[in-house]
Structures are given as C-alpha cells and as structure tokens.
C-alpha cells in the first residue's frame, strides 16, 4: 500500500503538478494580454474616436451610439463588425484604414465592445 501511494505521489508531484502550474501560468498571461489590449484600445480610442464618440455616444448621429442596443440593432456587436466599421467608415464616419494599424483597430474594437457590455 505504501509503495503504491509513494509511486502515485511521484507521478503527481513529478508530472501532474508541474503541468498544472504551467497551465495556470499560461492562462494568467492570457488575461494580462487581454487587459493590455483593452488599455491600448482605450488610448487609441481617446486619441482618434472620443471627439465624436465620447462615453459611447455619437455627436454626429445620436441614434447610432456605441451602446450595446444600438450596436446590436446595426449589426455592429462583434469585434469583426466594429473593425470593419473602423476600417471602412460609413456615412459621416471616416475610415481609418492606413491611419491606424490593424492591431490598433482590433484593440479599439475590443475596447468598444467591452465598454458596451459594461454599459459605458
């Protein structure tokens, strides 16, 4: 019995525990990267979008805010849809293709969606 327990302990502490620690580290890095992307998105938003969209509003067209209900109503409730809007623009909103990088657009879109989910 003791020999079996000792062998199981070696397996657990030699293989399973290091794997669990490794996986925990990977998941914590993912959350840190996501937080950094949102922070970067917030900074890009402040410099390029807030003049018209401060607080998730729309100074030009008040019926098309960045609030979740309006994003859903206009089919803009995903990162991909928001990136397409930022890239190409539409109506009074200019496109930002070539003005900000694709990764910056993705960070802004993630930030906008996160804020919309939180109610701005």
From Swiss-Prot:
Q: A single Gene Ontology molecular function, please?
A: iron ion binding
Key word Iron present:
yes
Tell me the Pfam families matching this sequence: Cytochrome_CBB3
Organism superkingdom: Bacteria
Output the PROSITE patterns linked to this UniProt entry: CYTC
A single GO cellular-component term on record: plasma membrane-derived thylakoid lumen
An example Gene Ontology biological process: photosynthesis
Q: What residues does heme c bind to?
A: 49, 52-53, 93
Keywords for this protein: Electron transport, Heme, Iron, Metal-binding, Photosynthesis, Signal, Thylakoid, Transport
Q: What is its main location?
A: other
Q: How is it modified after translation?
A: Binds 1 heme c group covalently per subunit.
**Which range is the signal sequence, renumbered to this chain?**
1-35
Its localization reads: Cellular thylakoid lumen
Q: How does it assemble?
A: Monomer.
Q: What does this protein do?
A: Functions as an electron carrier between membrane-bound cytochrome b6-f and photosystem I in oxygenic photosynthesis.
Task: Enumerate the NCBIfam families for this protein.
Answer: Cytc6PetJCyano
For this chain, the family text in UniProt reads: Belongs to the cytochrome c family. PetJ subfamily.
Tell me the protein's name.
Cytochrome c6
Source species taxonomy: Bacteria, Bacillati, Cyanobacteriota, Cyanophyceae, Synechococcales
């Amino acid at each position: 019995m003791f020999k079996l327990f000792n062998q199981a302990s070696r397996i657990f502490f030699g293989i399973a525990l290091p794997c669990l620690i490794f996986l925990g580290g990977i998941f914590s890095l993912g959350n840190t990267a996501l937080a950094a992307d949102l922070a970067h998105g917030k900074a890009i938003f402040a410099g390029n979008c807030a003049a018209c969209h401060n607080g998730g509003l729309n100074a030009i067209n008040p019926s098309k805010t960045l609030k979740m209900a309006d994003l859903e109503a206009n089919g803009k409730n995903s990162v991909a849809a928001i990136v397409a809007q930022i890239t190409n623009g539409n109506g009074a909103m200019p496109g930002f293709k070539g003005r900000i990088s694709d990764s910056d657009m993705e960070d802004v879109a993630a930030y906008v969606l996160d804020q919309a989910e939180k109610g701005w």
